[in-house]
Amino acid sequence: MTSHPRDTPQFYLTAPSPCPYLPGQEERKVFTHLVGRRARDLNEILTQGGFRRSQTIAYRPACETCRACVSVRVVVEDFAITGSQRRILQRNAGLIGTPEPNRPASEQYALFRRYLDARHGDGGMVDMTVLDYAMMIEDSHVDTHLVVYRERGPDSAIHGRGVGAPVAVCLTDVLADGLSMVYSFYDPEAASRSLGTYMILDHIQRARALGLPYLYLGYWVDGSRKMDYKAKFKPQERLMPQGWVRVE
């Protein structure tokens, strides 16, 4: 019997299931566990290779007949903000995002619940309990944290924190070459503020301030309206069979 060192990743393939993005398609994923002393290094390598993280799992699409899911990352230093994106930043100038430890809180879950019910009522996460949410946030062996967005208060310029309940939240991994937005959610009743776009713009600024070259956005899915927004942050690089390809 061949033995494998505990730190050597083992990869597995899921059974086919309905694709959540493209009607009539089936998805399969290849995945491995991010555990042990090499979890952080493995997450770095796999993210650069097009994997995404969910708790202690790293996965990427391995569909048999479709290649629509494409990993994308924004080129931070060269990012060219558009007029509409600049207006979104101005519209949300009253918000401040604070990095916090990846610890769940009841006010986060309340916002998460409202977001799911309003935006993804037919999705696979809709039945997540408060315990499920806590595991999504806490269950990690990599360098990760929350960025919690609240309204600015009179003392926010002093202590860097907002006031009141969270308006938006992003679970963010810190990599050697960038930030990775693992999962984000926001107040569904504030649609006019374009909070999803705002958080991406804010994370581009955060990556630039840290001297990191990329912001990883996950998968852009050609043909899916849900994922069209990811193509609007340019220049970006898309992971193709020949490697990362720049798109202006």
Swiss-Prot record:
Source organism superkingdom: Bacteria
Ranges in a coiled coil: none
Keyword Transferase: yes
Predominant place of localization: cytoplasm
EC number: 2.3.2.29
This protein's GO CC annotations: cytoplasm
Compartments, as annotated in UniProt: Cytoplasm
Catalytic activity: N-terminal L-glutamyl-[protein] + L-leucyl-tRNA(Leu) = N-terminal L-leucyl-L-glutamyl-[protein] + tRNA(Leu) + H(+); N-terminal L-aspartyl-[protein] + L-leucyl-tRNA(Leu) = N-terminal L-leucyl-L-aspartyl-[protein] + tRNA(Leu) + H(+)
GO MF annotations, alphabetized: arginyl-tRNA--protein transferase activity; leucyl-tRNA--protein transferase activity
Keyword line: Acyltransferase, Cytoplasm, Transferase
GO term, biological process aspect, one: ubiquitin-dependent protein catabolic process via the N-end rule pathway
Its job: Functions in the N-end rule pathway of protein degradation where it conjugates Leu from its aminoacyl-tRNA to the N-termini of proteins containing an N-terminal aspartate or glutamate.
Family: Belongs to the R-transferase family. Bpt subfamily.
Name recorded for this polypeptide: Aspartate/glutamate leucyltransferase
Protein source organism: Methylorubrum populi (strain ATCC BAA-705 / NCIMB 13946 / BJ001) (Methylobacterium populi)
Lineage: Bacteria, Pseudomonadati, Pseudomonadota, Alphaproteobacteria, Hyphomicrobiales
